[in-house]
Amino acid sequence: MADFLKGLPVYNESNFSRFHADSVCKASNRRPSVYLPTREYPSDQIIVTEKTNILLRYLHQQWDKKNAAKKRDQDQLEIGETSAPPRKIARTDSQEMNEDT
């Protein structure tokens, strides 16, 4: 091992005193974890990714949820105004006040 380290800029044998080549091989003997699918998908299925950023998509969805109720209310007001004018109802309390005086 000393011959291998001779050309390196910093040479100190104690840096590699605990190194054992056998220990590296033992760690790699473990089987890697493998994904096993639970469903069968068609082989001709095409997976398409979204072009927009995930964060931007999430923020747009949240904004749409937040403003959906406001937009719906505004649309109903616009429809109500154009379809029929609001009815005027005579106030009954003003007549009672005039009778008291």
UniProtKB/Swiss-Prot annotation:
Keywords: Ubl conjugation pathway
InterPro entries the UniProt entry points to: DDA1-like (IPR033575), DDA1_dom (IPR018276)
Keyword Flavoprotein: no
Residues in the signal sequence: none
Gene Ontology CC: one annotated term: Cul4-RING E3 ubiquitin ligase complex
An individual GO BP term: protein polyubiquitination
Pathway in which this enzyme or protein is active: Protein modification; protein ubiquitination
Domain of life: Eukaryota
Keyword Cell wall biogenesis/degradation: no
Ranges where the record places region Disordered: 67-101
Assembly: Component of numerous DCX (DDB1-CUL4-X-box) E3 ubiquitin-protein ligase complexes which consist of a core of DDB1, cullin-4 (CUL4A or CUL4B), DDA1 and RBX1.
Family (UniProt): Belongs to the DDA1 family.
Cited function: Functions as a component of numerous distinct DCX (DDB1-CUL4-X-box) E3 ubiquitin-protein ligase complexes which mediate the ubiquitination and subsequent proteasomal degradation of target proteins. In the DCX complexes, acts as a scaffolding subunit required to stabilize the complex.
Name the record gives this protein: DET1- and DDB1-associated protein 1
